[in-house]
Amino acid sequence: MSQSARKILVTNALPYANGPIHIGHMLGYIQADIWVRFQKLRGNECHFVCADDAHGTPIMLKAQQLGITPEQMIGDMQRSHESDFSDFLVGFDHYYSTHSDENRELAETIYTRLDKAGHIKTKVIEQLYDPQKEMFLPDRFVKGECPDCGAEDQYGDNCDVCGATYAPTDLKNPKSVVSGAEPELRESEHYFFDLPAFGDMLKSWTRSGSLQNEMANKLNEWFEQGLQRWDISRDAPYFGFKIPGTENKYFYVWLDAPIGYMSSFKNYCSTTGKADWDTYWQADSEAELYHFIGKDIIYFHSLFWPAMLKGADFRQPTNVWAHGFITVNGTKMSKSKGTFIKARTYLEHLDPEYLRYYFAAKLTSRIDDLDLNLTDFAQRVNSDLVGKVINIASRCAGFIQKKFDGRLSSNVADSALLEDFQLAGDNIAELYEKREFSRAMRDIMALADRANQYIADKEPWQLIKQEGSEQEVHEICSLGINLFRVLMVYLAPVVPKLTEEVQSFLNDNFTWDSHKTALTDHPIDKFKALMQRVEMDDVNAMIDASKEEQASQTPAVEANDELKKEPIADEISFDDFAKVDLRVARIANAEHVEGADKLLKLTLDLGGETRQVFAGIKSAYDPEALKGQLTVMVANLAPRKMRFGLSEGMVLAAGPGKDEIYILNPHDGAKPGMRIM
């Protein structure tokens, strides 16, 4: 490279150590891995680290349920995660755990520095307490009736039915999820990080180019509402690190989790000697630091994390890059539909490079959700990788092997065409750098089309029949192999295993600059099939296996189980029922609600007027999949003002929640506005 090598540290969001990796998780890890492989191919000094997020109440309780220690559980889970990442060709330079000596030391260092600088405050708060388990209950470990709409079996932070948010202490008739006991209200002293003290610094940093514009704009809401002090402590019993100077207080998992980036890299530096930790983390560091994360953890990484680092006199990230979620066939990943696919289940049926390429073909630098349409997935991989790229080598290699002793020609048949392919490298490199992988794949496949068209026009299989045509055929097919080689250099960050096989076939080793050269008078090996086509039978077998996994994990349902869980309500008169005006409505539009975890905003067409309704169905439906559907709404429900806007009715749905919510659909013959009697 003409410029000096950059020093780069890349991290991925830490997977939580209480469950397996699924293909939704893999999106972010594949995105980061492609970017890292590109940087290394360019000759940059790029280090790629990650770790398991191994602390918190959920891990403590799950280990108790399994009858093992938390240490044993997180150890088993780490091995499982590392195996999945390795088999998906995610090439971490180091993978560690937040339950480590390095992480404890760094967490204590950061806390102590913040405390000495006056950024740690204490406050007595009221919390729900389980008297049987003798533990304070986090919001997701208490359930009760929603204080707004009265819906039963709702968690302690928000309602799945009406979308209301509240404190656990606001629940009616609360019960501990851990023991079923009625919790008590008790006081406890907690430790808080003074986030408001960093308001000016964060406003400047979030607009410095370190975040995507969508992220920076979203964070304005927090600044407008006013930053609040952040509770960084949890009461014993808790699986984590004890706060220095306390007897029964522990660091909240989200305090020591991002410090895991630092501790994983610290262990990597000390065990391998391949990098100097201070060079990448001290306040005056000139190295580049990038975090790849999901959009659901933006706040922790773009507010709390940079403020903690600033207050403890460490450097801030160069960029925090968020990605969206995945849907499968247009809807949320669903266990019942078999589209909640574990990474290991995928690997047992399909080549990981299929998914790596498909994700790359759809990923952009924006925070957009990505749909894994399984039919399109098979068609695109078969068309692009097998039908276009590999087909070039398949069409040319046989002639080289059989007619020319496996040696490429000394001359280039069409230097202008080869130069066009080579000149495309700068633009493709820029697209990789900017994480515009989708555009890069389109450009590469456009080149592949040109290469195939060149071979089709030259028809070497016909030309070879003509006497004296051997040299021309040799040069045509040799150019085809060189065009294929350039394409594989460009694809190397996406399909590393295929690239290794191609390098072996070509007797070559790639760097990014390999695209600027050609192989002439060069031996190649006999061509072997480099990739099999995606078979829909294998895709369907994967879906069936996912369904079977879900069935094996779900207890058998007794007859009338739904009625047992929620008995039929008290009898009402016909006059009472007649007061409820149920109408057929067409979903004219559906969209996400900024800041809402459960809600979608629906625009409902009643055949003469439109209504805006907020529905707690986000966990089960992709907005695009809802548009145009008929549904049923309560049309005369009094409008309800929510913090996201006015909700002018309610749509009807059934199901226990999460991905199992089913909106009611009238027969296609029904028309918007019709009353249901």
UniProtKB/Swiss-Prot annotation:
Any one Gene Ontology molecular-function term assigned to this protein's record: tRNA binding
EC number: 6.1.1.10
Binding site for ATP: 335
GO cellular component, as recorded: cytosol
Domain of life the protein comes from: Bacteria
Motif ('KMSKS' region): 332-336
InterPro entries cross-referenced by the UniProt entry: aa-tRNA-synth_I_CS, Anticodon_Met, Met-tRNA-synth_bsu_C, Met-tRNA_ligase_1, Met-tRNA_synth, Methionyl/Leucyl_tRNA_Synth, MetRS_core, MetRS_Zn
Names of required cofactors: Zn(2+)
Cofactor: binding details: Binds 1 zinc ion per subunit.
Subunit structure, as described in the record: Homodimer.
NCBIfam families reported in the protein's UniProt record: metG, metG_C_term, PRK00133.1
Family according to the record: Belongs to the class-I aminoacyl-tRNA synthetase family. MetG type 1 subfamily.
Function comment: Is required not only for elongation of protein synthesis but also for the initiation of all mRNA translation through initiator tRNA(fMet) aminoacylation.
Protein name listed in UniProt: Methionine--tRNA ligase
UniProt lineage: Bacteria, Pseudomonadati, Pseudomonadota, Gammaproteobacteria, Alteromonadales
